[in-house]
Amino acid sequence: MFAGATAGTDNFDTLSKGLSKEGAWIAAISKDLDASDKTLNVEGDFKNKEGEEARKLALYTQDADRKVTERYTLTVKKLEVNSPQFYISNGTVKGDVEVNAEGFHGQTGKGVDGEAMIDGNLIFKNQELLDAYNKLPSEEQVKVTGETTVK
């Protein structure tokens, strides 16, 4: 397991490795990261510390009490989600997000104004994935500035 991006990185290649099949269940950035000409692929099946299937992209830092202290923006050409139960936590992905695996959602932490956000389009592989996403509670849906569609 690769742990380089779990504590937060400011390097696209490290983040990419953290979200690869050989990565970790969680990957994080430690400041705004601009990779607007690149596609970030999320691959593999992972479990969190509770043993539940999950994959997390943390776009924030927090204090010792787990209160979010700063949120960040990850700018990419495209974020391609191929890991089940992947979620964006407390920050913004600027670029299109393409969902090819079940369970995609967002997370808002305690003490955060706003929510996980996509400044771009949210594109699902098929209608079944979009329908499942639309059934989520509003606090698990990501705010999207563009269109939410099926490709």
What are the residue ranges of the model-derived segments?
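Detector for repetitive beta-architecture
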Residues: A24-I26, K56, R71-N90, K94-D96, ...
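Short, charged/polar "capping" segments at the starts of alpha-helices
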Residues: A35-D37, E128-N134
